[in-house]
Amino acid sequence: VMTYMVPPYVGAMAWLRLLNPTVGTLNKFIADILHLSEMPFNIYSVGGLIWVLTTFYYPYAFITISRAMEKMDPSLEEASKISGASPLKTVATITMPMMMPSIVAAALLVFVSAASCYGIPSIIGAPGNIDTVTTRIIDFVYLGSSEGLSDATTLAVFLMLVANIILYLSTFVVGRKQYITVSGKSTRPNIVDLGKWRIPVTI
């Protein structure tokens, strides 16, 4: 979660240093090892923008969801396994429904944070002619005209409406069910050995 403590534009500059399509350090290293005629990655792309945004805002989801998993009563999953349910069915019918409020809250937090971010899109997206709502708002403001300010205000209101609609939908989805677990004693979360799936799940 170190990226949680680093300003987004600083991280964007770091990734730019690594994956710049012409002089990126990591790009040149991979190209030299594999004897490639051109750089393998282009940070000035939609994929590059999504990657950098993901690396910076996944800690929001990680902290929210991991904390909820620590507090979840493992006896529910144990009861499911004793009843003959497979691990996959236990996850689908017990773990995921219990985690849904935290997952929805984390998704909402990440969306709002990423959608309102300006630093990363301006550094990564702008050179590749990739516009986002925040970069367009700043572009309109820099026009300095009344029309530019009006367009910037319209986009800002649009972004706010989208965030509120998503908040309402998430509240509606979570509010349809009750997620209260009553337990008379403290519990310890189960530690699951992922084995060969550890690296894929981490990625």
What are these regions (language model features)?
Residues 83-85, 97:
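Glycine/proline-centered hinge or cleavage motifs at structural transition points of membrane proteins
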Residues 70-75, 85-88, 126-129, 142-149:
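Juxtamembrane helix-boundary/capping and inter-helix hinge elements in multi-pass membrane proteins
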Residues 1, 28-35, 74-82, 93, ...:
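Short amphipathic alpha-helical coupling elements at transmembrane boundaries
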Residues 20, 119-146:
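Glycine-rich helix-loop "coupling/hinge" segments at transmembrane-helix boundaries
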